[in-house]
Amino acid sequence: MAKTPVRARKRVKKQVVDGVAHIHASFNNTIVTITDRQGNALAWATAGGSGFRGSRKSTPFAAQVAAERCAEAVKEFGLKNLEVMVKGPGPGRESTIRALNAAGFRITNITDVTPIPHNGCRPPKKRRV
């Protein structure tokens, strides 16, 4: 007895108008994640995953390319407005925001959510070059 083929239902992309761009800019890499208002990730990209390795990964240009790739991935969701949350002291902070703005998103709010300790852990020693 032949089984009837099971057809997979086509996934319908949900339409999201407002989103949140989480930018994690460390000294070594930049991670861009775009989520909806509830925090469900729509797309993400990193400077390292965009083809930059080693010290080139920690450049503003690498962060810009990562933001452009992430913006391209969320175009299919119909995203228009972005709220930006920046975390970390890295070199890709500004260039990422500029790239998202140039990609056609309306940036409504920019928030710095860098965790600042109330005298918690001892920081790493200063570099002597």
Curated annotation (Swiss-Prot):
UniProt GO BP: translation
Listed InterPro entries: Ribosomal_uS11, Ribosomal_uS11_bac-type, Ribosomal_uS11_CS, Ribosomal_uS11_sf
Pfam families per the UniProt record, alphabetical: Ribosomal_S11
Molecular function (Gene Ontology), one example: rRNA binding
TM spans (from-to): none
Subunit organization: Part of the 30S ribosomal subunit. Interacts with proteins S7 and S18. Binds to IF-3.
Family assignment from sequence similarity: Belongs to the universal ribosomal protein uS11 family.
Listed NCBIfam families: PRK05309.1 (NF003698), uS11_bact (TIGR03632)
Name of protein: Small ribosomal subunit protein uS11
Organism field: Mannheimia succiniciproducens (strain KCTC 0769BP / MBEL55E)
Gene this chain is encoded by: rpsK
